[in-house]
Amino acid sequence: MMVNDIEYIRQAEATRVQVLSEALPYIQQFAGRTVVVKYGGAAMKDSHLKDQVIRDIVFLSCVGLRPILVHGGGPEINSWLDKLGIEAQFKNGLRVTDAPTMDVVEMVLVGRVNKEIVSLINQAGGLAVGLCGKDGNLITARPQGQEGIGFVGEVSNVNIKILETLASNGYIPVVSSVAADDSGQAYNINADTVAGEIAAALGAEKLILLTDTRGILKDYKDPGTLIPKVDIREARELINGGVVSGGMIPKVTCCVRSLAQGVRAAHIIDGRIPHALLLEIFTDVGIGTMILGSQYS
């Protein structure tokens, strides 16, 4: 082994030790706290990124946090609709969900995507349990109310008992965003919304949305304009001023709503960055946008 190689290894090991040392106060601070992660976007489609997210979730559990993973699965739903000859339709950004589409959504999210994530977490050394809103009356749905979108729902109620039981015993709940109303009719609910409502009901330490953007940007075309930290008032001003627009509006609104109901901090981060979760939670700088209930408290 060359001298340069030895020096490189020493530097790499020193960096690893530095990272662990920097993480220690955060590990101590968040031990026993609940972190709700919404998993979606490119991090679900890229197998390498998927592996890193799974390992990050298991790491959180191993160091004493209580992670709860909520997932979507739009691309796989579209793939199966195509295979079955059902046209995917959208209205105002929402998937039009008629009865045949609802059957496919439930089959894909609950039967395929959810169980794949559970299996991957278990293979990585975690203890995952797959759920949808129907299990243990976890989520009660109601119609979203917009005309012509079918069985698209909103969260009417969250029963946290099953989540608390699992998380307090070392299990990692993995939740798909399908739920039923009081009559048993299934509804497709936006996964960001489900994550936000679960975080609020649990009084979670953090809500983290994995997205395909750096966070809130002053100029959406320039990743260098990332806004690292805002409070609820500033977040609302960014929406009203048009800085937050398009698909970011429901994400920021979801964060603001959860904070108003008691979540300590909400984060919008880029799931395409390797180990984005660990970088955001356990480093001094973070990598995305953190939204707080009041002025940087």
Swiss-Prot record:
Keywords attached to this entry: Amino-acid biosynthesis, Arginine biosynthesis, ATP-binding, Cytoplasm, Kinase, Nucleotide-binding, Transferase
GO molecular function: acetylglutamate kinase activity; ATP binding
Domain of life where this protein originates: Bacteria
Residues carrying the site annotation Transition state stabilizer: 38, 251
Pathway(s): Amino-acid biosynthesis; L-arginine biosynthesis; N(2)-acetyl-L-ornithine from L-glutamate: step 2/4
EC number(s) from the headed UniProt entry: 2.7.2.8
Catalytic activity as recorded in UniProt: N-acetyl-L-glutamate + ATP = N-acetyl-L-glutamyl 5-phosphate + ADP
Role played: Catalyzes the ATP-dependent phosphorylation of N-acetyl-L-glutamate.
PANTHER family assigned: N-ACETYLGLUTAMATE SYNTHASE, N-ACETYLGLUTAMATE SYNTHASE, MITOCHONDRIAL
Name of the protein: Acetylglutamate kinase
Lineage: Bacteria, Bacillati, Cyanobacteriota, Cyanophyceae, Nostocales
Gene designation per UniProt: argB
